[in-house]
Structure formats: C-alpha cells, structure tokens
Regions:
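Phosphate-end processing signature that detects enzymes handling 5′-triphosphorylated RNA
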Residues: 1-158
Length: 158
C-alpha cells in the first residue's frame, strides 16, 4: 500500500509535440464517495482495479492501492459501475528537469475540451519545473477528480 503525492494543473497550451507516449483509458467507478473511491480501468491493453482514500488538507497526497486484473474482468465490472464512464487519452511528457514525467489527460465525451496534467512527487515540497503549456493549479479541487467528472462532467460547467 502506498501514498500518492501529485500536483494537478489545467493545460493551456500545446504539449503533444513533446509527448513520447499516448494511451487510451476507459474507466468507471464502483464507489465514488470522496473517502474511498474504487475504480476499474482499461489502460491500453491492461486492466486495473484501484482504491483511493481521502486526500490530505492540500489535496496533494492520498492513499492509493492498485492491482492489475484481466481486461475481461474490468469489462464485466464496468457494467455494474455507477453511471458515467470516463474516456480519455493519457499522454506522457518528460519534464525539462529530467526527473519527472507529466501525465496529461485529454478527455472525450461529456468531458470533451478538458485537459489536465499531473506530476507525481516524492513529497509535497519537492521542486519541479513547470512547462509553458501549464495553466492554473487545481490540486485538491474536487471538481477535477475523475470520480466527480463522471457525476458533473465538464460540459455542464459552461
């Protein structure tokens, strides 16, 4: 079991030329209460189940447990998930500091037009370079949690 520490930002510029990998992701939630989310996901050719706990005060750190499971099982579990499926492409972009990799998620469907970037850190105060294409920080803002995007998608914000 591990603690995940990450910072999340909106994306305001073009990042795709810097991406070295792109993977399609489809995911649903068996539980989306903030205290404990249970997610199933198909990421490329692999399946996963993930449990996340409530975040700390800043929203940057929280418990995360993940296990690979067969894609067929994910497909079956998606049928009993809460309404709303998240569909996105995740791009990986090496940071200019050479130490970090940005995960940039471009959303589709009801969340079309939303793009966010996350960077995982060893601790909340670890320094990292911010690429020019980053926008405002949204770390800890619940409306940008994937589990909330399925309930209140981006298309409803306008």
């Amino acid at each position: 079991m591990a603690q995940e520490i990450e910072k999340k930002f909106l994306v305001k510029g073009d990042f795709k030329a810097e991406a070295f990998k792109a993977t399609r992701i489809t995911q649903g939630y068996l539980s989306s209460v903030p205290e404990r989310t249970v997610r199933v996901r198909v990421k490329g050719e692999k399946g996963f189940i993930t449990i996340k706990g409530i975040g700390n005060a800043s929203g940057a750190a929280r418990f995360e447990w993940e296990k690979e499971i067969p894609v067929e099982e994910v497909q079956q579990l998606l049928e009993i998930c809460e309404p709303g499926v998240i569909d996105k492409t995740r791009y990986l972009v090496k940071n200019t500091d050479g130490k970090h990799t940005w995960e940039v998620d471009e959303f589709y469907g009801d969340n079309d037009g939303l793009t966010v970037a996350e960077v995982e850190l060893a601790d909340e105060n670890e320094p990292f370079d911010k690429p020019a294409w980053l926008g405002d920080e949204v770390t800890g803002d619940p409306k940008y949690f994937n589990s909330m995007l399925m309930k209140n998608p981006y298309k409803n914000w306008k």
